[in-house]
Amino acid sequence: MTRYKATIAYDGTDFAGFQSQTNQRTVQEEIEKVLSKLNSFEPVILQGSGRTDSGVHAFGQVIHFDLNGKARDLERLRFGLDTQTPADIAVKKVELVPDDWHARYQKHEKTYEYYLENSVTRSPFHRHSKAYFRYPLNFELMQGAMAKLVGQHDFTGFTASGSSVDDKVRTIYQAEIIQLDKENFKFIFRGNGFLYKQVRNMVGTVIKIGNDRMPVSQIDKILTSKNRNFAGPTAAPEGLYLKEVKYEPINEI
C-alpha cells in the first residue's frame, strides 16, 4: 500500500457537503468511486482535512488515501483522477506522503475566504458563488469587529449546536475584510482550526454589525459569554471557500 496526499478544488453547489452521507451526492463519494477504479475496484476510503457543508466550495481542500502497490507516477495519477471525477471537482496536485501522514490530524492551519455581494439588486450570475446582502454596510464597523476575532479565544459562542468537539479554543492568526469594489467584500480567516459553522457564524455577526444592528463590542460579549444567542445569524453557504490547508513540511520518503 502507498499513501498519497491530494489537493482538490470543488464547486459545492450540487453537493450535500464533503463527507459521505447515505443517499446524498458528496465530494468524498465521487472521488472514492474513481479511486476504486484505479485500485482494481477494491474500495478506497479517503480522509479529508475537514468537512465542508452543503453549498460550500473549496479552492484547496486536502485529502489522503491509500492505493495498492508501489508508488505510481504522480502526474498520471492526478490526471486520471482529474479527468474521471465530475466537472465540479478538480484534482490540482498529488504527492507521496509517509504511511502515517494524516490529512486531518497532521498539524496544519486553514484559510477560509468568504465573498459577499452588497448591492440593491442581486446578480443572477453570482447566485452560487457569492452570498448576497442588499442593505447598507459600514466598512469601518466591520473592520473593527474582525480585529476583535484575532487571537486565541474560546469560540463556543460562534459554533453551531451540532458541534461534537469538547475543546472549543482556537487561534485565529488573521481576520481581515477587504472591499474589492463598491459592491463586493472579501472576508479572510486564517487559523489553526475552526469549529462547526464557526466561519459562517462570524461572518453573519460581522454583517449584522456592519448594518449597525449590533455594536462592535458585541464580539467581546459573544466570546466572554460563550452564548450562541448573542451572535448574528449563520451566513449563507455559497459565499464560503476553503482556500488553503497548510501543513508542516513533509520529510523525504
UniProtKB/Swiss-Prot annotation:
Signal peptide range in chain numbering: none
Keyword annotations from UniProtKB, A to Z: Isomerase, tRNA processing
Substrates-to-products reaction catalysed: uridine(38/39/40) in tRNA = pseudouridine(38/39/40) in tRNA
Top enzyme category: isomerase
Known EC number: 5.4.99.12
Active site: 53 (nucleophile)
NCBIfam families noted in UniProt: hisT_truA
Family designation: Belongs to the tRNA pseudouridine synthase TruA family.
Protein's UniProt name: tRNA pseudouridine synthase A
Protein source organism: Lactococcus lactis subsp. cremoris (strain SK11)
